[in-house]
């Protein structure tokens, strides 16, 4: 009926398959069923599928998913940056007070020797997570951006000053403001996601839990007042940083 643009098949009801009406279609590719031909291979294939399903249900990136724009193998050096880019997107939207019409994802460091385009998907997922009612995934994030006319670009450079790898989200808002959020991913014993910059302020803050950002007049007593108000409201402060 012409409803399917193309298909690839390697599993058939009866194998080996030597005759099928599907062979007549130019837009259908058929191959012998070579994978998972042993019990051990079938077990590993089942585990791989189960892991992918778990990732999808958790809203995380699924490698090799056919309906993900940046699908495929993600380098081990890039994987830790996926949750970082997503968190930066969430912080960006919170600080901006909404989604910016255009955002650039800047990636710096030797990691750009690998394909880092998947980080734009992670950033979009974070940008829209708190502004739409539906669940935001790596699949629908680009669609949400397109529907709202939001453009998300990618910029890469090998040079970075203070960190081996740095990811920055930069965007201009409709009111003329520019919002910039930067972060890095620490590996090894101190493995964590860190916020390193917000607009013109340098930070060194773990990107976990509930984050509060305040802009106030630089004068004595303000930090104490903020701490007192939060304490009276029953809010426990795990860490605090002041930047100028």
Language-model features and meaning:
Residues 67-244:
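A conserved regulatory-domain signal marking ACT and ACT-like small-molecule sensing domains
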Residues 1-95:
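Rossmann-like dinucleotide-binding domain for NAD(H)/NADP(H)
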């Amino acid at each position: 009926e012409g409803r399917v643009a193309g298909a690839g098949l390697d599993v058939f009801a009866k194998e080996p398959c030597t005759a099928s009406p599907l062979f007549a279609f130019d837009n259908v590719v058929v191959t012998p069923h070579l994978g998972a031909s042993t019990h051990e291979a079938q077990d590993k294939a089942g585990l791989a599928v189960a892991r992918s399903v778990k990732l999808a249900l958790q809203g995380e990136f699924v490698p090799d998913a056919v309906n993900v724009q940046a699908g495929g193998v993600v380098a081990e050096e890039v994987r830790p940056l996926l949750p970082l880019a997503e968190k930066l997107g969430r912080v960006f939207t919170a600080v901006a007070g909404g989604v910016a019409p255009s955002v650039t994802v800047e990636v710096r460091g030797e990691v750009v020797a690998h394909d880092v385009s998947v980080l734009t998907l992670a950033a979009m997922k974070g940008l829209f997570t708190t502004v739409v009612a539906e669940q935001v995934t790596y699949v629908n994030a680009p669609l949400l951006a397109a529907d709202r006319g939001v453009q998300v670009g990618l910029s890469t450079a090998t040079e970075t000053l203070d960190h081996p790898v740095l990811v920055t989200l930069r965007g201009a808002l409709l009111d003329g403001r520019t919002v910039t959020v930067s972060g890095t991913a620490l590996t090894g014993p101190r493995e964590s996601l860190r916020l390193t910059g917000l607009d013109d302020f340098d930070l060194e803050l773990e990107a976990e839990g509930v984050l509060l950002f305040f802009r106030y007049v630089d004068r004595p007593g303000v930090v104490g007042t903020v701490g007192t108000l939060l304490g009276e409201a029953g809010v426990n402060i795990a860490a605090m940083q002041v930047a100028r």
